[in-house]
């Protein structure tokens, strides 16, 4: 059953996207054996200007290596590439709302950004919006809570529509 999700993910991409991912995968698969090893993964990160310890690389590999064979195959590589671009977009959106860069989004920060985007809502609406995702009860939205909010757009739409 787990492979069904991966297969449907692969079917939703265009052939050109698949070809681009294959080219990138082949570039990182230095020895051409069809899989990326820990050392090749280290070279991937170095090429992007980041270096990690072997322990950190092994942790990254463990997260990506769906079939637990100690390597990243092309399917696993494609899956992580697709999901990481989404994660980057969510991080960028969080940073947009986090006006004072303290790692938390307040109701007034949400209010300012939504109003700039042309959405009409009150600070009270934003407080209610935060209340739906504020699992730690601090009255703010941290990154984890923001991810939850972004994956449930009905929270935003419902709160703003009810104003």
Swiss-Prot record:
GO molecular function ontology, one term from the record: calcium ion binding
SMART domains assigned to the protein according to its UniProt record, in alphabetical order: EFh
Residues annotated for Ca(2+) 2 binding in this entry: 65, 67, 69, 76
Binding annotation for Ca(2+) 4: 134, 136, 138, 140, 145
Binding site for Ca(2+) 3: 98, 100, 102, 109
List of residues that carry N-acetylalanine: 2
InterPro entries listed in its UniProt record: EF-hand-dom_pair, EF_Hand_1_Ca_BS, EF_hand_dom, EF_hand_pair_protein_CML-like
EF-hand domain span: 16-51, 52-82, 85-120, 121-156
CDD domains in UniProt: EFh (cd00051)
GO cellular component: cytoplasm
UniProt KW Transmembrane keyword: no
Taxonomic superkingdom: Eukaryota
One Pfam family linked to the record: EF-hand_7
List of residues binding Ca(2+) 1: 29, 31, 33, 35, 40
Keyword Acetylation listed: yes
Keywords for this protein: Acetylation, Calcium, Metal-binding, Repeat
General function of this protein: Potential calcium sensor.
Designated name of the protein: Probable calcium-binding protein CML26
Chain's gene name: CML26
